[in-house]
């Protein structure tokens, strides 16, 4: 079997999708297909047994060769530190990062601005994964509504800064924005 040729990634790719939509698997395939050193920047925290098990399963599913960095709060700096000309960074996921920021009482909008600003100067490609949470009904609880509002604004900000934006549903990617323009 022939080894596929590396596929060049644009500087910034944003991948959105629902829970269990296949967005992370798609992002991993893009990063591995780049031929660069894959870096997995995880934002999840093992705050309960179910999340600890989920993190363990994710680690086992990834092929060997991934460098894993865990950073639940200081994502802009972690992305900048992990990026390199010979590396492709996958950030999974932005909505968990937002949750961490909200629960820590951080300024979510400022953190989103900081992340967006860091993306322009990275020496290698980054693939950002996030849950699209704005497709359902307006949540009843104030914290849930605040979270959905922050996620929507962050996604819009990052989509504007990204070279490629994809939406994944049922494992199928749909380009919302392709390198060089809109689709």
Language-model regions: role of each:
Residues 5-9, 85:
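Catalytic phosphate/metal-binding cores of nucleic-acid and nucleotide-processing enzymes, i.e., regions
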């Amino acid at each position: 079997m022939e080894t596929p040729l590396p596929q060049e990634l644009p500087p910034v790719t944003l991948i959105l999708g629902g829970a269990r939509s296949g967005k992370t698997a798609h992002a991993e395939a893009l990063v591995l297909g780049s031929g660069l050193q894959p870096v997995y920047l995880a934002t999840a925290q093992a705050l309960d047994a179910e999340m600890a098990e989920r993190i363990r399963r994710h680690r086992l599913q990834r092929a060997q060769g991934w460098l894993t960095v865990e950073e639940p709060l200081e994502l802009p700096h972690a992305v900048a530190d992990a990026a390199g000309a010979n590396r492709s960074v996958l950030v999974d996921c932005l909505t968990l990062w937002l949750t961490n920021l909200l629960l820590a009482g951080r300024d979510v909008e400022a953190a989103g601005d900081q992340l967006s600003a860091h993306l322009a100067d990275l020496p290698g490609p980054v693939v950002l994964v996030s849950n699209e949470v704005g497709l359902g009904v307006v949540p009843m609880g104030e914290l849930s509504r605040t979270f959905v509002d922050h996620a929507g604004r962050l996604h819009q900000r990052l989509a504007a800064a990204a070279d490629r934006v994809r939406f994944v549903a049922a494992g199928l990617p749909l380009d919302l924005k392709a390198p060089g323009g809109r689709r």
